[in-house]
């Protein structure tokens, strides 16, 4: 009888421990725990979000507006607020590290183009890497330098801490999942690198 009780207790404790770890994972995304967050601007955010969702280790994506002049931002007024269309990416660094994410990022942007990606032009379509902790800067600098060396040119990609981020309107979230034939400046085959 005691053996059964002990076994039941261990199973419950194990379930509680797993639940507790999931809560920590959700609660502490930016504090060196199981999950880290980076914000990437790469032109129209619909395609950038769909591109990053495919990778193992990417736990969550969301589109929004970042690094503008004020805290308020919406799709219609981006040209006034100075925000960039940005994708928030939460990832497990034990599965995919920041350097790998940035290597993928540079596969889908033109890093020399100022305020333009594909046919989309305007300050809201600029490229940017917006970090959440100083620990990320070393990895960012390493990848940026590598790309600059390969291109023999200074990049037009902003590298700054994240500020004034606002989640985009619901109709923009997972847009290309809801509208598979919707517009995207990223080639369709780029959405299947993990297949």
Walk through the language-model features, giving the residues of each.
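Flexible coil/turn and secondary-structure edge motifs
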Residues: 2-5, 9, 13-21, 25-195
């Amino acid at each position: 009888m005691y053996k059964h009780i002990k076994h039941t207790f261990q199973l419950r404790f194990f379930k509680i421990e797993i639940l507790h770890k999931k809560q920590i994972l959700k609660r502490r995304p930016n504090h060196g725990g199981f999950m880290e967050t980076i914000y990437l601007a790469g032109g129209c955010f619909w395609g950038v979000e769909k591109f990053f969702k495919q990778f193992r280790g990417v736990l969550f994506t969301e589109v929004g507006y970042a690094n503008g002049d004020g805290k308020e931002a919406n799709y219609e007024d981006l040209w006034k607020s100075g925000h960039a269309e940005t994708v928030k990416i939460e990832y497990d660094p034990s599965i995919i590290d920041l350097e790998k994410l940035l290597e993928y990022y540079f596969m889908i942007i033109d890093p020399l183009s100022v305020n333009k990606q594909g046919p989309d032009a305007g300050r809201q379509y600029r490229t940017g890497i917006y970090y959440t902790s100083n620990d990320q800067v070393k990895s960012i600098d390493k990848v940026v330098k590598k790309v600059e060396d390969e291109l023999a040119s200074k990049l037009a990609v902003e590298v700054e801490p994240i500020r004034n981020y606002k989640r985009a309107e619901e109709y923009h979230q997972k847009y290309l999942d809801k509208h598979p034939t919707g517009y995207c400046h990223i080639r369709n085959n780029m959405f299947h690198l993990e297949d």
